[in-house]
């Protein structure tokens, strides 16, 4: 909902030569964005116009969540290098606290917003915002459960298996502002004497 969130959009069509520069998304991440939803091309070592080496150029300390429909960015079994999902989450001290990325192809339908990867992405957002499921792992599972009735359609079955979560599945999106508990005042005998 736009009345509750600041939404930043990066569309190729809005840039000279229909190509926004990678520094745009890097600046968004460095400025503390909470969520990124990516619909675009990827590979094992490339997503959101960034190559895995670019993850080391990030300086953010407020980590984000990324959901990408791109191909292969979550291919953790790639033989030649760690996939970019791993670089966003565990290979650097910056980037994302969690990502959902495809181990293989992202599946779309030309001229439609009902592609197979988009169905899982939409159901993920429905789980978080519509069904009130704040845990990132439960929301990912729910997106898969909600697509079971059409498991035989096109490439739904493939996306079911390949849309993988990198990160702690028990992490929750904020439902309210977190405040740390009060530090307990521990009183007792000094120096271990009773």
Regions found by a protein language model. Give the residues of each.
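Proline-centered linker/hinge motifs at extracellular inter-domain junctions
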Residues: 178-185, 189
